[in-house]
Amino acid sequence: MRRFSTIVDLLISKKPSSQANSRIDLICKRFHISRVLNNDFVESTERKNGVGLVCPEKHEDEFAGEVEKIYRILRNHHSRVPKLELALNESGIDLRPGLIIRVLSRCGDAGNLGYRFFLWATKQPGYFHSYEVCKSMVMILSKMRQFGAVWGLIEEMRKTNPELIEPELFVVLMRRFASANMVKKAVEVLDEMPKYGLEPDEYVFGCLLDALCKNGSVKEASKVFEDMREKFPPNLRYFTSLLYGWCREGKLMEAKEVLVQMKEAGLEPDIVVFTNLLSGYAHAGKMADAYDLMNDMRKRGFEPNVNCYTVLIQALCRTEKRMDEAMRVFVEMERYGCEADIVTYTALISGFCKWGMIDKGYSVLDDMRKKGVMPSQVTYMQIMVAHEKKEQFEECLELIEKMKRRGCHPDLLIYNVVIRLACKLGEVKEAVRLWNEMEANGLSPGVDTFVIMINGFTSQGFLIEACNHFKEMVSRGIFSAPQYGTLKSLLNNLVRDDKLEMAKDVWSCISNKTSSCELNVSAWTIWIHALYAKGHVKEACSYCLDMMEMDLMPQPNTYAKLMKGLNKLYNRTIAAEITEKVVKMASEREMSFKMYKKKGEEDLIEKAKPKGNKEGKKKGTDHQRYKGRGERSRAKAL
């Protein structure tokens, strides 16, 4: 395990690899009807202005004090490894697996913080990572898309502690491949398992099908299922996975074909199969078929359960005109003695809030509490989003306080909503207060939270604070794939306000060798165009040359802009250098330089035209085209 720090140091600095995939999801042995509502139903040194990043306060449990102590050390020294290791060595921390896991969890999306701590712990005498710690680290690395490092860790586990390698690691790996739509790699995990002393069984294969079907690859899952029929004989679990996948995509004919295959295999559908089919009908808008299926279920001796009613209510809540029908289904459910649970109530609240009926949402909220069903953060989230749409900031704050009084503490998603609204309304100090409160409650901001704050600071002119948060986000390893909208807005505002050095500092933090950010042509184009727009032509050209050193060819309009700017400066030397490299790159890519150059010039001319003139010209052209034709020929042309 000691060699792992060397292996990962080599891998972590590279771009994410497609040869090794992540394994973040915990093993879920229940295969179908995920009852968590989807997106359809949920639609950073203090400054004199009170703006800045703060350290969180303590949690009250066994590890609380040490966790926050370590987290503060990581926050303060993560960009300077020698100082970080010295501070950790002098901290007097008693390492044990439970503490390591808590620290990794505390780091949240800040993968670099957890990674640095894991490496430091690896080097400590007398300490050895447990299976749970290694699995947690695998989750963090895979979430950072450092897949080479993930494989490096597993390989090191095989050499030093092979008994720590369990099938669940590979199940998580398959799920991460599936979520990235890398079906071939997901299937290849089955072939890799024997190399680590494990043989894939029916459970592992079932997890593979389940992962593919839940991530939109049901067609590929069907092929894998057919190809491996002999090795893994069909069972009800496999068919249920395929049925779920087809129903989720709204392909009911294929779903019915799965039912036929199921019967041919001598298998009878159970309540889960019926619920999946019911969900398929409901979300395809075929409510009459869904109701008929409910009646058929009763005839077959399957009394619809809360899952069945909930999928109907969720589907009905998608349409404003069918909210009354959703309530009728809810009443019918109670009439049949089926008690609604938190997901059912949340679906109703989500529907009312989605269509602006917040008062009815609160009414359902009160009703569920009276019946002993305690709302969750997801439930409150529906109402919070509705208040955000109406820009009701005070109501959001009141709801947060109400949640706290009821023992349901706001999660990261809820803070994101309220902070976003505060920034939108110009309440930057309130946004910072909420940020500080969030971190004090032990919540680590993710990329969404950082982006919200950065955009809020930028829009209100707090550019120094925006830069600080941006650099903090990058240093925590959260910004591995640039959010181009945020990057463009920040760089453009800095250059526009003549803060060129600050802009260069921002760019350097994502382009240096230690950064895990993925920089492509789009990111470089944003930076080069921002410099050019403010008249910094030579700097733009310098960065363009840097980009080409990385074997990235500038876009045609970027080349055309730089040539135009250099022509005005009478700087033929730099123009010749850039042109020579572009010609060479075009040749290597079997492109015509003349066509490339012409395309760039045409793009500049097109962008220089006022939009109104272009539309007017287009209309005039159409008028001339059809002038003098008869109605029949004009209709034919259209």
UniProtKB/Swiss-Prot annotation:
This is Pentatricopeptide repeat-containing protein At3g49730. PPR repeats lie at residues 130-164, 166-200, 201-231, 235-269, 270-304, 305-340, 341-375, 376-410, 411-445, 446-480, 483-513, 520-554. Belongs to the PPR family. P subfamily. Keywords: Repeat. Residues 604-638 are annotated as: Disordered. InterPro entries: Pentatricopeptide_rpt, PPR-containing_protein, TPR-like_helical_dom_sf. The keyword Aminoacyl-tRNA synthetase does not apply. The keyword Repeat applies.
